[in-house]
């Protein structure tokens, strides 16, 4: 079974409850749907300069809660990539706000 990679756009902070819960939620959803999913944190500073080839390796993106992001442009760049490539995208809380800005 292929592994579907989901990029978690945001700056992981163990103090943010949602950041600790999101990987568990993805894991539970994957097991319910009989998929193999890898949820990979993508720090916004990294996303500012990440190659398009790196971004193409993901089946979808989740712009996660928790902000402000360290690099707003990195988050917006990745949201734009998802929109332009018609890649599945979810923005929650601050992630939704960034999607609206983009």
Per-segment meaning from a language model:
Residues 1-102:
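N-terminal beta1-alpha1 cap of cysteine-dependent amidohydrolase-like domains
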């Amino acid at each position: 079974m292929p592994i579907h990679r989901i990029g978690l756009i945001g700056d992981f902070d163990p103090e943010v409850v949602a950041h600790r819960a999101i990987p568990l939620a993805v894991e539970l959803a994957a097991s319910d749907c009989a998929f193999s999913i890898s949820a990979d944190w993508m720090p916004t500073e990294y996303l500012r300069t990440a190659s398009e080839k790196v971004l193409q390796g993901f089946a979808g993106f989740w712009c996660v809660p928790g902000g402000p992001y360290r690099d707003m442009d990195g988050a917006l760049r990745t949201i734009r990539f998802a929109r332009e490539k018609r890649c599945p995208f979810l923005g929650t809380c601050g992630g939704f706000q960034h999607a609206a800005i983009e």
